[in-house]
Regions:
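Subtilisin-like serine protease catalytic core
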Residues: 1, 9, 35-37, 60-63, ...
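Secreted peptidase-domain scaffold signal
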Residues: 45, 169-184
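Structural recognition of alpha->loop->beta junctions
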Residues: 56-72
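Solvent-exposed loop/turn segments at secondary-structure junctions
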Residues: 4-7, 46-50, 71-74, 85, ...
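Substrate-binding/access-modulating region of protease and related hydrolase catalytic domains
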Residues: 1-60, 89, 106-114, 118-120, ...
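Internal glycine-rich alpha/beta core junctions
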Residues: 80-100
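Structural recognition of the beta-strand scaffold that forms the well-ordered cores
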Residues: 1-2, 32-34, 39-43, 65-68, ...
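Hydrolase catalytic cores
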Residues: 54, 98-160, 164, 168, ...
Length: 184
């Protein structure tokens, strides 16, 4: 849940054209980990209501699942960063609750908290459960399944990406694909 676009030295700040998944070192490293078989889940960033607006590295990396934030009613959190990448890929990939997320404080009291740093681990936990149920999938297959199971999968955009993932739909889709493959 780490991303940035501005530096102490403004000459090093990222520009939109840098968001190609290859320019930023952290994006290249996230993509490398994904290529080795890890599921990398990144927060989209909280720059949506500022002048930058765009997803921050490493959320622009290829083969990572970048998560934006919505409220519990499915409405975009105004701070959630948007895409797309400079090379035209859809980002964020999916959305999860990040506005009014229920989190437990160090004092043991549950409170609401805001940020894609909350939507990302929520999605990460759901993806981990899905992978546990479908251990034969590769990381890339799993991420593609999560995208295809979003409520906007038929028309992804640069704000919601593929939308809110229905993990039961993802599981059922995987089982159907497996049955189709086994039946051939």
């Amino acid at each position: 849940s780490l991303g940035y676009y501005a530096f102490d030295d403004p000459s090093k700040d990222y520009r939109y054209c840098d968001l190609d998944g290859k320019f930023a070192l952290m994006s290249r490293q996230a993509a490398k980990a994904a290529d080795k078989g890890m599921v990398i889940v990144c927060s989209a960033g909280n720059a949506g209501s500022g002048s930058w607006k765009k997803t921050t590295p490493p959320g622009d990396a290829e083969n990572v699942l970048t998560v934006g934030a919505i409220n519990k009613q499915g409405v975009l959190a105004p701070f959630s960063s948007i895409g797309n990448t400079a090379d035209g890929r859809v980002k964020p990939d999916v959305m999860a609750v990040g506005l009014g997320s229920d989190v437990m404080g160090t004092d043991g009291i549950v409170r609401g908290a805001n940020g894609t740093s909350f939507s990302s681990p929520i999605m990460c936990g759901m993806v981990a459960c899905l992978w546990q149920a479908l251990p034969d999938l590769t990381a890339k297959e799993l991420i593609e399944l999560v995208r295809r199971s979003g409520d906007r999968a038929d028309s992804p955009d640069n704000i919601y990406g593929y939308g809110v993932t229905d993990m039961w739909k993802a599981y059922q889709l995987a089982m159907k694909l497996k049955a189709d493959t086994d039946g051939k």
